[in-house]
From Swiss-Prot:
Signal peptide: none annotated. Residues 103-237 are annotated as: Urease beta. In the N-terminal section; belongs to the urease gamma subunit family. Coiled coil: none annotated. Keywords: Cytoplasm, Hydrolase. The keyword Membrane does not apply. The keyword Nucleus does not apply. This is Urease subunit alpha. GO terms for molecular function: nickel cation binding; urease activity. Residues 1-102 are annotated as: Urease gamma. GO terms for biological process: urea catabolic process. The gene is ureA. Pfam families: Urease_beta, Urease_gamma.
């Protein structure tokens, strides 16, 4: 049996979830890892059964664990659990917010921040692009995803988004509802600008030749409008 790295990760997560289920059945309070594994494992199983929608699991997932089921401080550490699950009609992201009720106590390792604004991506020039979701499902794009290669049903000027990512905090995301149109800010991807993976539109150095190749592949694979006429304006210092 040969498994892909992604399949191995899911198998490991499923195994961890089973161990957490056994611990919970014995009355053992779960730690952070066990709680996340249990919730993720149940989501994957119920999604595979095909009897629940994403919305159903997002709601039901908040009922599986209570504060008395986890160790002190764990509830406040789990802000959300996101898992890509296989439904009968494809893979979908299920995000469960505040899956465990907070007990109100101080969390282990809690950080108290100063009451000051935090500047992200300081010194990076940004452009603004109008983006429209022409699909019938929400699309969520993470902070460091190569925006040029996002879902093909997002319509925008792909050429202007080459080698760029969202100008948002690391680990966060922007969500586009079906039919929604809004502007987003993009900044250059840092590092050596060698872009691999995502939707395999580049898979090389993101230079002029890489951009030309990427645009060609995007057009061939039907990635929205390669040039939809959206205007980009440099409006951030």
């Amino acid at each position: 049996m040969k498994l892909t790295p992604k399949e191995l990760d899911k198998l490991m997560l499923h195994y961890a979830g089973r161990l957490a289920e056994e611990a919970l059945a014995r009355g053992v309070k779960l730690n952070y890892t066990e709680a996340v594994a249990l919730i993720s494992g149940r989501v994957m199983e119920k999604a595979r059964d095909g009897n629940k929608s994403v919305a159903d699991l997002m709601q039901e997932g908040r009922t599986w664990l209570k504060k008395e089921n986890v160790m002190d401080g764990v509830a406040s550490m789990i802000h959300e659990v996101g898992i890509e699950a296989n439904f009968p009609d494809g893979t979908k992201l299920v995000t469960i917010h505040t899956p465990v009720e907070d007990n109100g106590k101080l969390a282990p390792g809690e950080v108290f921040l100063k009451n000051e604004d935090i500047t992200i991506n300081a010194g990076k020039e940004a452009i603004s692009l109008k983006v429209k979701n022409k699909g019938d499902r929400p699309v969520q794009v993470g902070s460091h995803f190569h925006f040029f290669e996002v879902n093909k049903l997002l319509d925008f000027d792909r050429a202007k988004s080459f080698c760029k990512r969202l100008d948002i905090a690391s680990g966060t995301a922007v969500r586009f509802e079906p039919g929604e149109e809004k502007s987003v800010e993009l900044i250059d991807i840092g590092g050596n600008k060698r872009i691999y993976g995502f939707n395999s539109l580049v898979d090389r150095q993101a230079d002029a030749d890489g951009k030309k190749l990427g645009l060609k592949r995007a057009k061939e694979k039907g990635f929205g409008s390669v040039n939809c006429g959206c205007e980009a304006t440099k409006d951030k210092q």
